[in-house]
Amino acid sequence: MTSDPLASPSFADRWRRGQQLFWTWLADLRLAILLLLAIAIASATGTVIEQGQSLAFYQENYPTDPALFGFLSWRWILSLGLDHVYRAGWFLGLLILFGASLTACTFRRQWPALRAAQRWQFYQEPRQFTKLALSASLPQGKLDSLEPLLLQRRYRLFRADDVLYARRGLAGRVGPILVHAGMLVVLGGAIWGSLGGFYAQEMIPSGETFQVRNIVDAGPWSGSRIPQDWAVKVNRFWIDYAPDGRIDQFYSDLSVVDREGQEQDRQTIHVNQPLRYGGLTFYQADWAIAAAQVRLNNSPVLQLPMAQLPAAGRIWGTFVPTKPDLSSGVSLIAKDLQGTAVIYGSNGEPLGTLRKGMAIEVEGIRLSLVDLVGSTGLQIKSDPGIPWVYAGFLFVMVGVVCSYVSHAQVWALEQDGQLYIGGRSNRALVAFEQEMLAVLAQLDAQSNHSAETAIA
């Protein structure tokens, strides 16, 4: 009858040994540094390579011949998921492995160190003080004299008869744990933002109402965050120009409306001043000329859509028919919303400049420019992980501050007319040594004063 290898002591020993090696490897600081470096390189790659673009974009900007750096082409970018680095499985795997390494380090190193700092014992033999980095003995020293000196220096005291233990700065042991916890919260927020967030772009003319539909990039769990029961109305879009004609700032007056058209919120946004509503953030990112409003002779106002022309700079144009059958017409060209357009004939010759509120005769028609209608370019982002990331960084900052607190310990024993004192600190050793020397000097002065008083 053969024994079960799973129940044999040798297998159990190998299993425990394997577990121990695994957790030791996972908690290794070198592994954490390597993972952090890999995450940093991946994040930098995601910053350099445009994210969430179309296949045509990558084929145009990263051709196979010649490939960037000799190897980086659109095929590599798509196959490695470099077009959506922050949602790629390998990147999320790096974050999870880094989080596991931090967790293992916390429970195998930092937490035991904190528990050890909370456990203390009295030194009841003079020989115990010899193993401390800083120790001394004073003849005729008294614990009663030592206590107030330590209390003045914010030590917490524990005393039993002729032995004393004091400590200060336990927060210094808590600091690394808070740093690790904060980093774990940051990682969790980053993962949640990648899986549950989305990014959209919209180009909306003034006066139009829209719902978020043009999703550029989205996580697999982001569907519930796309609003279905409210929309945004662009009340007005306008641009402020500097005296030299340069754009100073562009603005969008936005209203959030429900299904019944009732306004729920209204804000005017501009660059670096977005609208936040319902977990979404609307950024002012771009602009365009949506349409030209013109009048032909005494006709009603006609709104003709304008399109950006494939030319250098930002130029928009539209075709203005001068005959009912659309067989003839002129081109209206504009480069901004300052109310000026240039009219070109069918042969490409310029016919004149037209300003807002003015008219020009072209091909027997009186053409008036009523207005140029602008479109606001909005970037819409939803990142449910941002609050967690901010909270995590708060934990990290508090932990870093706590880590600078020195954890100092002092032991004392009064025996056979001698006062034995010793101590140690995990940091700021010079300051701790100076502090202990000052305490010893005060004790020595008090002992001498007591001796002189006794002689007198």
UniProtKB/Swiss-Prot annotation:
State any GO BP term from the record: cytochrome complex assembly
Which InterPro entries does the UniProt record give? Cyt_c_bgen_Ccs1/CcsB/ResB (IPR023494), ResB-like_domain (IPR007816)
Q: Which residues cross the membrane?
A: 29-49, 88-108, 174-194
Q: Where does it live in the cell?
A: Cellular thylakoid membrane
Record bears the keyword Signal: no
User: Has keyword Membrane?
Assistant: yes
* UniProt membrane topology term: Multi-pass membrane protein
GO CC, sorted alphabetically, is:
plasma membrane-derived thylakoid membrane
One Pfam family this sequence matches: ResB
Q: Which UniProt keywords apply?
A: Cytochrome c-type biogenesis, Membrane, Thylakoid, Transmembrane, Transmembrane helix
Provide the assembly information: May interact with CcsA.
Q: What does this protein do?
A: Required during biogenesis of c-type cytochromes (cytochrome c6 and cytochrome f) at the step of heme attachment.
Q: Which family does it belong to?
A: Belongs to the Ccs1/CcsB family.
User: In its UniProt entry, what is this protein called?
Assistant: Cytochrome c biogenesis protein CcsB
Origin species: Synechococcus elongatus (strain ATCC 33912 / PCC 7942 / FACHB-805)
The organism's lineage is: Bacteria, Bacillati, Cyanobacteriota, Cyanophyceae, Synechococcales
